[in-house]
Amino acid sequence: MRNVFSFVVRRLWQASVLAMLIPIGGFAQAAAKKPIKVGIIGLDTSHVIAFTRALNDPSSKNYIPGFRVVAAYKGGTPDAKISWSRVDKFTAEVHDKWHVKIVKDIPTLCSMVDVVLLESVDGRQHLEQVKPVFAAHKPVFIDKPLAGSYKDAKEIYELGKAAHDPWFTASSLRYWSQTERLEHPEGIGRVLTYDVMGPTIREPDEPSLFYYGVHAVEMLYQLMGPGCETVSMQTSGNEDVVVGKWKDGRLGVMRGFSSGLYAFSITVYGTKGVLHSKRVPDGYGGLLHQITKFFKTGVPPVDPRESLKTIAFMQAASLSRARGGAPVPLSAVTK
């Protein structure tokens, strides 16, 4: 809460100074002409194209007024093919199509913007890249995965806490319309538990669930809530099954396929019936709504402590898989 308070105080101070400088009646006009300036770190993911289009192009179906991407830091890493194979293409598109200024380093970026989207596809880069953002006291959204390990994720949490700056991380699948519908289902009585499915595509340089399995993990946490204590993971061919045991005894199941089937689904079991989701995600609109709301209010829609637990869940799953599916307590990762 102290992080949020500090951010809100800064924004109120800025607004009060601006109000003193602008005649009454001209404030709304000035605000309309001065959108919140957004900076992007890491141009090696398709998210930067979707987000820039939504914030800069009024004709976009997901357009959100009042924001503009004005600067970006290229980033990228030679350690991950998913990064180096795409970063030049996305950088050129952001610069040439959307006229976003490409800057040489993150401190320069922070000096030009009000808020930051940390988008680097390799979560292992996030800790070092977010440090100058916290030093500049800029609110930041950190795209999935939060980090490449629980250790790095915990350090991000501690740095944000020390800087008194708000941040959050989330997958777009947390805000899929089907996730929201089935979080509070109708007509099936009391909810017992959930099964979710999503791709578990692997990258050679990323732990098993960190690159793409994170989407299904985030869905499961959004639906089940916090409180998972142990995780087990088994793999057969291209199929992965992860079972989390919550402290109230519920079992949340995540199923994924590392190749072949690319789909997302949710099944919710209640005392009076079962409901299933549709299998087509509806883009980034829901996530972008949460991000821009966060940038305006400074209130994270996902508790950072829950985000730490999702990283611990994935790391514990990797340990379980390496141990032949034996259950691994999250405490083995977080201690």
Question: Where in this protein do the model-derived segments appear?
Answer:
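N-terminal secretory signal peptides that target proteins for export/translocation
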Residues: M1-R10
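N-terminal glycine-/serine-/threonine-rich beta1-alpha1-beta2 phosphate-ribose binding loop
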Residues: V4-F5, I22, A28-A136, E158, ...
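Bacterial N-terminal signal peptides
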Residues: R11-G26
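C-terminal helix-rich "cap/oligomerization" subdomain common to oxidoreductases
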Residues: A31, V116-L117, K296-K335
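Short helix/strand-capping hinge loops at secondary-structure junctions
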Residues: H137-P139, K144-P145
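A contiguous active-site-proximal alpha/beta segment in oxidoreductase catalytic domains
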Residues: L146-E206
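Rossmann-like dinucleotide-binding domain that binds NAD(P)(H)
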Residues: Y194-L261, R305-A312
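C-terminal substrate-binding/catalytic lobe of Rossmann-fold NAD(P)-dependent oxidoreductases
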Residues: D240-H289
